[in-house]
């Protein structure tokens, strides 16, 4: 989990069907601050004697690179969202960054020459205090030189999908529901 804002964690409770289908707790990887907030917002998922139908989560606090499914190394990327530090993630040669407004130079080193760069882009113009806008993203793309970039966490202020796609560089695309990326 990148951070504790509602649009990033409130849906955890809706994952109950997956938890019940798998008959085991759902692992959640996050930093200590986010773990504390998840326990605060979903206390019923962590009590010893849960009521029938309550979800069950296992919190794994991230402190450096960790491994998913015993095969995928995940490197956390420290990013800034307005005035709070949140996480992005790098999986092999793909990075996922959402809700970023700044990336420190030391963290940019982890993001250079990726196969796939997934980054938030709220709108085309009018700077925002907590999210990148298109000119900032395109500047990052030039600096980091990923082979492909997908824009996420976009608003209606960016424009219509087909129109925006024609305005973007060849290696930058809008993400969309159902998009599958191989890396």
Q: Regions from the language model: what does each represent?
A:
Residues 1-97, 106, 163-183:
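Binuclear metal-dependent hydrolase catalytic cores
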Residues 2, 97-98, 119, 152:
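Active-site flanking residues adjacent to catalytic metal/cofactor-binding acidic residues
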Residues 101:
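Beta-strand/loop nucleic-acid-binding surfaces
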Residues 104-183:
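Binuclear metal-ion centers of metallo-dependent hydrolases, dominated by the metallo-beta-lactamase
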